[in-house]
Regions:
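Non-transmembrane alpha-helical segments in soluble domains
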Residues: 22, 30, 43-48, 71, ...
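Extracytoplasmic/secreted proteins, especially bacterial periplasmic and envelope-associated proteins
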Residues: 16, 38, 42-45, 99, ...
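Bacterial N-terminal signal peptides
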Residues: 1-6
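Short, structured active-site-proximal loop/turn typified by the sulfatase FGly-forming signature C/S-X-P-X-R
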Residues: 34-67, 73-74, 78, 105-111
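Active-site-proximal cap/lid insertion segments
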Residues: 24-33, 37, 163-167, 175-250
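Active-site-proximal N-terminal segment of extracellular/periplasmic enzymes that hydrolyze or transfer
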Residues: 9-51, 60, 178, 184
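A short beta-strand-to-alpha-helix junction
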Residues: 35-40, 57-62, 87-97, 202, ...
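Catalytic-site neighborhoods of secreted/periplasmic enzymes
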Residues: 69-171, 175-197
Length: 250
């Protein structure tokens, strides 16, 4: 998920840009796209004051290929970043391919990036600051180091925007969450009883029960039957899945 804000400054012709990137965010929980109840009031406020994209797709349903496509404007078969593998299998983006950061920098912008990278070189041109983990606890849901890093990312971005440079800038605040829902599955693998939470459990989607697996696309069959996270959830009941959805939405 991504939100783009433009902050025009009267003293300069070039506007400033803030890009907020949320890993694994689905529009099905975003109020601006009709989710009821909405899990994203701040995003909804931004959307109400600007433009929303109603028909947008990622370049690939994997982190590194998708991010390389986003920051370069090219599809994975053009960037050659095709998986989440290490560099000896998955080469980084060639220097010959322009990136969003290199184009903005070449045109007089300060390009800064805070937070998650996982970009295979596609953030070239941005000055990156690694976030510092800020531990916290949640009384109802497990949290880990990736979530702690998001606190540091937010604080770094706010500090930068509170004291912006004189030249025009493009700033990216790149968050780990809600991708950490993958870790929730591992924390609750197998048969288990979930602890009660303070809010009502959400209902499961209408397509939760699959009547005919053979009618589903092969990639979906693979994810549902072979992926390690689905193996960890193989013995979950419907109540476990409702807690899982609640964890994602919170």
């Amino acid at each position: 998920g991504m939100a783009l804000c433009s902050f025009p400054v009267m003293a300069q012709q070039s506007p400033n840009f803030l890009i907020i990137q949320c890993d694994h965010l689905t529009q099905r929980v975003v109020g601006a796209y009709g989710a009821d109840p909405s899990c994203t009031p701040p995003i909804d406020r931004i959307a109400s004051q600007g433009v929303t994209f109603a028909n947008a797709y990622v370049g690939c349903p994997l982190s590194q290929p998708s991010r390389a496509a986003l920051w370069s404007g090219l599809m994975p078969h053009q960037t050659n970043v095709r998986s989440n593998s290490a560099e000896h299998i998955n080469p980084p983006l060639p220097d010959s391919i322009p990136t969003l950061g290199s184009l903005f920098t070449a045109n007089g912008y300060e390009a800064v990036h805070f937070g998650k990278t996982h970009d295979m070189g596609s953030l070239r041109g941005f000055r990156h600051k690694e976030p510092v983990a800020k531990p916290f606890t949640d009384p109802e849901f497990p949290v880990n180091n990736d979530s702690f890093l998001d606190v540091g990312t937010c604080e770094d971005a706010v500090a930068y925007l509170s004291n912006p440079p004189q030249e025009p800038f493009i700033c990216i605040a790149d968050f780990q969450n809600p991708h950490n829902i993958c870790g929730y599955v591992g924390e609750n693998k197998g048969e288990h009883i979930d602890s009660p939470i303070s809010t009502p459990l959400p209902l499961l989607p209408e397509n939760f029960e699959v009547e005919n697996w053979e009618k589903l696309p092969l990639p979906i069959q693979y994810i549902c039957c072979s992926h390690r996270r689905m193996m960890q959830a193989a013995h979950w009941n419907e109540d476990n899945y409702r807690h899982y959805v609640a964890a994602f939405q919170h």
